[in-house]
Each structure stands twice: as C-alpha cells, then as structure tokens.
Amino acid sequence: MSKAMISRENYLQQLIQFKDTDFIKVISGVRRSGKSVLLMQYRDYLQQQGIASENILYLNFESFEYQWVKDAQDFQQLIQEKMPSSQEKIYFLIDEIQFVEGWQKIVNALRVSFNTDIVITGSNANLLSGELATLLSGRYVEIKIYPLSFKEFLHAKNVDSQSRLVDKLYSEYEKYGGFPSVVMADEPLKETILSGIFDSIVLNDIAHRAGVKDTHILKSVILFLADNVGQLVNPSKISNTLTSERVPTSNHTISKYLDLLENAFLFYKAKQYDIRGKGYLKTNAKYFIVDNGLRRHAIGKKGANYANRLENIVFIELLRRGYSVDVGKLDSKEIDFIARKADEILYVQVAFEIPENTHETDNLLHIKDNYKKILITGKYYEQTEIDGIEVIYVVDWLLQ
C-alpha cells in the first residue's frame, strides 16, 4: 500500500454497509484526516464489485478543475455536463462540498430524481446543520473520521501489536499524533507537515470561511485551549486571561471563536455533567484538541504536561469508538469522562500513575450504579484492578 493510501478499514466498512441505500453518506472530520483517501478506497471497492468507471463520478471542489463552481446554479450545470446517459445507478463521490453555496438542494435533487448512491465529505460541522437536515429529514448517515488511532498507526507502520516496538512507537504517536501524512513522513519532515496542517485549518477552514480578518485573537484562543487541555474553562475565563496578557477581547468574541474551532473539528467540547443532579452544568466545559501532534506544534515545549496529553488521547479515542463524552462531577469529586453509547455508560479516570492515596479510584467508587468503571494509566502496572475497578495501561487500552 502506498504512503498516501493508508487503509481505513473501519470507516470503509461503514460506507459499504450503507451502499445502495437511500441514505446520503456524509464523511465529516478535520482537514487532512483522510476523507479524500477514504473516498478513493470506496471508489476502488466499487470497481472491484464490477461498477463501471463511467458510472462513478468523483468531484473534488478543492481542485483547480472545479474552482468555477461557486453556487447551486454552477453545481447544477456541472451535474448536467458530467451525468452519464447510463440507465444504471450512478455513484457520486463529492469531496469538500462546503465550498459550494447552496449545494444542499442539488444533492437532494440528485437523491430524489435519479438512481444514485451519494457520498459527500466536508471539513465543517455546519455541513449537517440547518438546511441539509431539513431537506433530507433523516435521510443521511454521518461517518465521523479522525486522525489515525494507535491501532491504525501500527498497521500503517506494519508493526504487530505484540511487537517489542509498540511502546517506542506509542511515544512517537503520542508526540507527533496520527495525521496520515505525518505518520508516514520521515522525522525531519513531520514538524513541517504539522505546521502546514495547522495553518490550513486556522487560515482556510476557520479564518477565511468565517471572515476573521485579524487572526491574532483567534490564534491566542487556540494556544490557550491547547495549553489548557483537560481544564475547566468558560468564555469569561478565556477573555480575562487573554486581556491580562494584552490581547484585549470580549466574551462574545471568545464564544464565537469557540464555535468556529468546534465547527472545524479542531477542538471538541466536553460539557460538565452533574451525576447526582442528573443534569448539565452550564458554567464550565473542557476542550480537547483533535490531535496531540497539533497541540505540541501549537504550544511547543509548554506542552510537556504528560497528564494533559494522556487525557487528550483517551478523550479522542472514546469519540473514535462512537461514544459521546462528558466530564463528570459528583459533589466535590471529578470524574474525568462519562462515555455514553446507546444503553452503555462507561466511567473513566485517567492518571499517569496510580496515586498512593487511591484518589482516582475512590472517585469512581462513589458512583453508586453498576456501569463499568476503569482507570487508564500512563505507566504499566502488573496490577489489573483496585477494589473491583479495572486498571489498564493506556497502550493496552488503545489496542483493545
């Protein structure tokens, strides 16, 4: 397999599962996480299934060829030019569709009026808000893609999970993250590639799309969040901190920028949930960055706090596994993560090492329900449980 084509088998199987259904498949995720490669792998799969090449239409709206397609009228013209005369099903693979204003109506018309199978990708969470949701009324399925998991990282390196190299490679993964192009690059180039990814997200996906002319405040917010991963924050706290550092701003501006950072999939928000009161606390939340490599690139040596990096890896992996994730509060005690999926609830504490005072497991023991509770550690221990709570080394957990 070429360096550019790291297999994303889990995501590919999700696409295949919905092939030839009425659902529009929406692949969403941060820039450079592998959405386009996944489209290419789906195209290869279709051809292997005997679908004729002329019945597969790939359109990339970031490419030079389609720069003229600005709105729904242009999009309709393009479809009329490209649509085969075949009576067979046409497979549309449409990359970075958010660059076309009003694309929703055209995609819905394709779904309704023609024999089609449609996959679209986008690097903005607003893709699935407002008009698309109304027009399609539940006729789409979202496939959320992230940078490589540690399992995928090892697979890309052709290293077995039982290899002695695993711990060494975890250190590389934890340092440089899981963006496919970074993973496959030689070490001297990794930093340069991360810099390019960071700039393209900040300048193209956030500042340019939202019309942010002065990026200084935006970058200051990013640096603050990256430096405070896993800390409870709110717009007022961020605004006051930046203002004290001679970056004058307002709560309103901070709130707007937080939304932009979430929409670009650069940061994910974990709301604080009161376990006893069974409700969300509105004041504070934690923010986690999509990739540890980007975090380290953004804040440099300040990012040496291993506990924060560990917590970030666990949070993103929980999202990758399909959980919705909150941070928990039980009276004065903090639960790092409450992860929910269908009827399942998982309580997670994260610690570099097992503290002598068993503080981390004590917090879990105070939760009086029967859902699973685990402690994920940054150091390896022979010990596998404390008072009935599973203790697992982060590398082993990532490889489950």
Curated annotation (Swiss-Prot):
Pfam families: AAA_14, DUF4143. InterPro entries: AAA_14, DUF4143, P-loop_NTPase. PANTHER family: ATPASE. To M.jannaschii MJ1544 and MJ1637. This is Uncharacterized protein HI_1038. It comes from Haemophilus influenzae (strain ATCC 51907 / DSM 11121 / KW20 / Rd). The lineage of its organism: Bacteria, Pseudomonadati, Pseudomonadota, Gammaproteobacteria, Pasteurellales.
